[in-house]
């Protein structure tokens, strides 16, 4: 038993999962299950805050690694003899790896805990990424490099699972959105930092250009190792009390793997949220893969300037996704779950319309760089806010299979990006500008099924609740969470 702070103790349950026993600590700050009722990023002595910062920094490193290749693609092309189609194939490989990794990460979090799953995944991906960077010598090696980097984004599921477990429902939307939003800035950081790091390796260290990109890749590898070790060194998984059981545990016993999986896969709301997320976060993945090349080709910008312009999209995550989480929690205070659902539909529809406009502006005969960037930033704000709004709903779907539901929803982002890439960005049927507009139209249509999501005790967009708060003892998983507890 290790003392951490006043009236706070670290306890190990029989099955080896760690949680905090708060005793009388923090009245009004934590609920009766030990979950934080508000997000205080500057309260660094609080274990909830420490976990929050570790979670987003670990995922930041994963996003940096996953999007490290596109900004230095011009330098990698001659070294690996890449054809134009190879970049698209590698992007699909990265997204496919993200899909596979996130599907696997959900049950892993439910059975092992998000902290262990996240730390191990970061270290494994760091090793695999370093090996891929060293041995890649052909287009196939480049595809393998992007695939390995894409696997690291499985940590998004662990990030959201961890936040959903240690923050109470009144703050979970904000906590999920801020942790994911700040982490997503890693993709923007890669757009800016990787070209600068590459130039430093070539100009200051005198490394040959054919080797310089491999040396540059040591940076994301080092970030993954550092954050992975930090997460594993952190001493606890969950807060104490009733919610402090090991993930996937109902009551005091651990559920079987298949029981956990069935709980999430059998809930239609998880599938609909995955579809919706596939066309908000999926749009973000597409834009972050094509934006730098779009600006280089359409506006004839140098590598560094194109990377900076493309970084504007990812940088909006610092404020837009948290804003979505804040909006989700605020509308829930006034309108309950119906408010969360309406807000998601409205914001994502606006982002889809702006995506259509980005493509139309880029297709103009004399496009304005400033105007195109401005509309792209507005599109990013709404699309990323929609992602925050989506994960303001996820924790209420199925508490006992939270990791599976998170994994299914997060995987929907990768599936949406893969399908969109195959439909609109592969081959020569559409120009990049036309493909971006088609992406927006598809997103607009795929947002409509939000209207079908219904919670038995909270209702949906058009239908009221089908059970009263007092109930009759027939409790389903969404009853485990009250919207404002």
Swiss-Prot record:
Q: Please tell me in which tissues this protein is expressed.
A: Expressed in the base of the lateral root primordia, root-shoot junction zone, leaves, ends of the husk and vascular tissue of the anthers.
Name any Gene Ontology BP term. nitrate assimilation
Say which domain of life the source belongs to: Eukaryota
| InterPro entries xrefs | MFS (IPR011701), MFS_trans_sf (IPR036259), NO3_transporter (IPR044772)
Its cellular-component GO annotations read:
plasma membrane
Describe its membrane topology: Multi-pass membrane protein
Which family does the record claim for this protein? Belongs to the major facilitator superfamily. Nitrate/nitrite porter (TC 2.A.1.8) family.
Its annotated function is as follows: Involved in nitrate transport.
| Designated name of the protein | Probable high-affinity nitrate transporter 2.4
Q: Which organism is it from?
A: Oryza sativa subsp. japonica
Its encoding gene is what?
NRT2.4
């Amino acid at each position: 038993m290790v003392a951490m702070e006043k009236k706070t103790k670290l306890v190990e349950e029989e099955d080896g999962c760690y949680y905090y026993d708060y005793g009388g600590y923090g009245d009004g700050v934590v609920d009766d299950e030990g979950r934080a009722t508000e997000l205080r990023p500057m309260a660094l002595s609080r274990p909830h805050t420490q976990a929050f910062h570790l979670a987003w920094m670990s995922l930041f490193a994963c996003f940096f690694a996953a999007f490290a290749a596109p900004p230095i693609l011009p330098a990698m092309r001659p070294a690996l003899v890449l054809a134009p189609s190879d970049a698209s194939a590698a992007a699909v490989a990265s997204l496919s790896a993200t899909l596979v990794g996130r599907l696997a990460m959900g049950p892993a979090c439910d059975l092992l805990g998000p902290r262990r799953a996240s730390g191990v995944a970061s270290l494994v991906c760091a090793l695999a990424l370093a090996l891929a960077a060293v041995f890649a010598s052909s287009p196939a090696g480049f595809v393998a490099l992007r695939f390995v980097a894409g696997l690291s984004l499985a940590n998004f599921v662990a990030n959201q699972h961890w936040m959903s477990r240690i923050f109470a429902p009144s703050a979970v939307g904000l906590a999920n959105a801020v942790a994911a939003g700040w982490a997503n800035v890693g993709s923007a950081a890669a757009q800016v930092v990787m070209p600068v790091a590459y130039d430093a390796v070539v100009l200051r260290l005198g490394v040959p250009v054919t080797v310089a990109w491999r040396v540059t890749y040591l940076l994301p590898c080092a970030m993954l190792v550092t954050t992975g070790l930090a997460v594993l060194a952190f001493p606890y998984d969950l807060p104490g009390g009733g919610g402090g059981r090991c993930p996937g545990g109902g009551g005091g016993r651990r559920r079987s793997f298949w029981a956990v999986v069935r709980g999430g896969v059998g809930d239609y709301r998880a599938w609909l949220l995955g579809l919706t997320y596939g066309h908000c976060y999926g749009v973000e993945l597409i834009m972050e893969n094509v934006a730098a090349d779009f600006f280089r080709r359409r506006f004839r910008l140098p590598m560094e300037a194109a990377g900076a312009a493309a970084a504007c999209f990812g940088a909006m995550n610092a404020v837009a996704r948290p804003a979505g989480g804040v909006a989700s929690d605020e509308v829930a205070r006034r309108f309950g779950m119906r408010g969360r659902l309406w807000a998601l539909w409205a914001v994502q529809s606006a982002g889809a319309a702006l995506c259509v406009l980005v493509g139309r502006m880029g297709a103009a005969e004399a496009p304005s760089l400033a105007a195109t960037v401005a509309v792209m930033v507005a599109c990013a704000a709404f699309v990323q806010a929609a992602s925050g709004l989506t994960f303001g709903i996820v924790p209420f779907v199925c508490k006992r299979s939270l990791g599976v539901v998170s994994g299914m929803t997060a995987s929907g982002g990768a599936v949406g990006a893969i399908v969109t890439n195959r439909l609109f960005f592969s081959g020569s049927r559409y120009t990049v500008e036309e493909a971006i507009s088609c992406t927006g139209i598809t997103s607009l249509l795929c947002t409509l099924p939000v209207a079908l999501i219904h919670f038995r005790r909270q209702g949906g967009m058009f239908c009221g609740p089908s059970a009263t708060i007092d109930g009759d003892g027939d409790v389903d998983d969404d009853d485990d969470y009250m919207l404002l507890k």
